[in-house]
Design a protein with these regions (language model features):
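Typically the conserved alpha-helix immediately C-terminal to a functionally engaged Cys/Sec
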Residues: 74-89
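N-proximal helix/coil linker or "cap" segments that precede and/or mark the start of modular domains
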Residues: 20-41
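A short beta-strand-turn-helix
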Residues: 41-61
Length: 164
């Protein structure tokens, strides 16, 4: 009996240590990544500005919902803004905006108008608007995830409008 108790304690101790080191790694990773969300910003007003720009540029608007608190949000942003191929697709087809959702600013007016798929799917989540501001699609990121990041090919298909 003591042997089984000792084994159980060792396993629990290892799980706690792994959990703590994993949490510490995420905190360190978040500290190194750019923070693209602006909690002080009026999201709906910014989207309205982007619609005017999208009409001029003949582009869609890709809205990434999340916050600087979300490591997966930061990972996605980092991938699409640092990978040359993904960045080129993003810049050619979209105006890219980070709509903040956090305790400091839940952007309730923007979500009242467009919905918040993050509440259903988790964060980040995406809204795709046409150049007139009409909602074309909502998207979760779960199907683009890989271990500790995103699958570049799946993200590319998403940006090209081919990920189903």
């Amino acid at each position: 009996m003591k042997k089984y108790l000792l084994i159980a304690l060792i396993i629990c101790g290892n799980l706690v240590a792994f959990s703590q080191s994993s949490s510490e790694q995420i905190i360190q990773e978040k500290a190194t990544l750019p923070k693209p969300y602006h909690p002080e910003e009026d999201g709906l007003a910014r989207i309205e500005e982007l619609i005017l720009q999208a009409k001029k540029d003949n582009k869609k608007i890709l809205i990434q919902i999340g916050g600087n608190w979300c490591v997966w949000c930061l990972r996605f942003n980092h991938l699409v803004t640092t990978d040359p191929e993904l960045k080129a697709i993003l810049e050619k087809k979209y105006l890219y905006y980070h709509l903040n959702y956090s305790p400091e600013n839940k952007n309730e007016k923007a979500f009242a108008k467009y919905g918040n798929p993050g509440e259903k799917y988790g964060y980040p989540a995406f809204l795709v608007l046409d150049k007139k501001g009409y909602l074309l699609a909502t998207r979760k990121t779960e199907d683009m995830e890989a271990i500790n990041g995103y699958d570049k090919d799946k993200v590319k298909k998403f940006l090209q409008g081919r990920l189903k």
